[in-house]
């Protein structure tokens, strides 16, 4: 991760600092939402979960070397003083805001190509292939495991460093608007849509709504960007009408095929 001060983090997420007397002197060099991964210099994200609350692990994170905590409330130590923290209304949204700022800082240093991938199937395999391809050209960051949502995408961004040239982002969605949110976060230069299938069709209200959601990626691209579309999938092929970007296509045959 690029080093960033507590003061700049608080500004990026519109948060309130507590327990940090000199925020300009506190430097964060990594971010995690897993207290077991904390190392000296870490920002620990106290994310509330379905079965446990990350705020419970703030003392453990601090003991392991966390220099700052992203929280939704102050957590007090044994003396009654707050652990160093940035307090926000929603830590997940704050992660997204911080990731957006990190991408801006990376691009201010040198050209960084952000490549985003979505599709009902094949995302993880494709991002692994892209990691290998781009990695042969220059320093490349890609998601760990299937980090593709509102938590996983920021965590991927946070692993980028000053020398990163390619940032590969996997994007998943369970609702319309999810991919638009992620694209607003990282501003991809290249967006690849692999296919539109029936996974999560019930949550979306039908396959056509899945196509609408996946197409948010190409809608987010600028005229200077590139959309990469599966020409064998009729719903993906139709997305060329939804983007201002240059369109490249791939496929196995001359005729589009319904999924």
Annotate each PLM feature.
Residues 48, 85, 207-211, 241, ...:
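Adenine nucleotide phosphate-binding catalytic loops in nucleotide-utilizing enzymes
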Residues 70-77, 231-234, 252-254:
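Short, polar loop motifs at secondary-structure junctions
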């Amino acid at each position: 991760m690029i080093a960033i001060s507590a003061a700049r983090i608080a500004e990026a997420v519109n948060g309130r600092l507590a327990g940090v007397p000199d925020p300009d002197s506190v430097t964060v060099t990594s971010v995690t939402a897993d207290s077991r991964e904390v190392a000296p210099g870490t920002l620990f994200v106290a994310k509330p979960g379905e079965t446990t609350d990350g705020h419970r692990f703030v003392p453990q994170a601090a003991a392991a070397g966390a220099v700052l905590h992203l929280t939704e409330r102050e957590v007090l130590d044994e003396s009654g003083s707050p652990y160093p923290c940035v307090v926000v209304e929603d830590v997940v949204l704050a992660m997204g805001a911080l990731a957006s700022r990190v991408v801006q800082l990376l691009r201010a240093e040198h050209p960084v190509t952000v490549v985003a991938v979505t599709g009902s199937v094949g995302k993880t395999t494709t991002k692994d292939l892209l990691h290998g391809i781009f990695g042969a050209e220059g320093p490349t960051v890609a998601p760990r495991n299937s980090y593709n949502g509102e938590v996983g995408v920021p965590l991927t961004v946070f692993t980028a460093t000053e020398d990163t040239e390619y940032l590969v982002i996997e994007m998943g969605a369970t609702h319309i608007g999810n991919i638009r949110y992620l694209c607003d976060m990282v501003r991809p230069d290249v967006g690849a849509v692999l296919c539109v299938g029936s996974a999560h069709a019930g949550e979306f209200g039908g396959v056509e709504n899945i196509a609408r959601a996946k197409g948010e990626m190409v809608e987010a691209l600028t005229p200077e960007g590139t959309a990469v579309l599966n020409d064998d999938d009729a719903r993906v092929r139709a997305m060329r009408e939804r983007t201002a970007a240059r369109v490249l296509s791939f496929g196995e045959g001359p005729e589009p095929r319904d999924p």
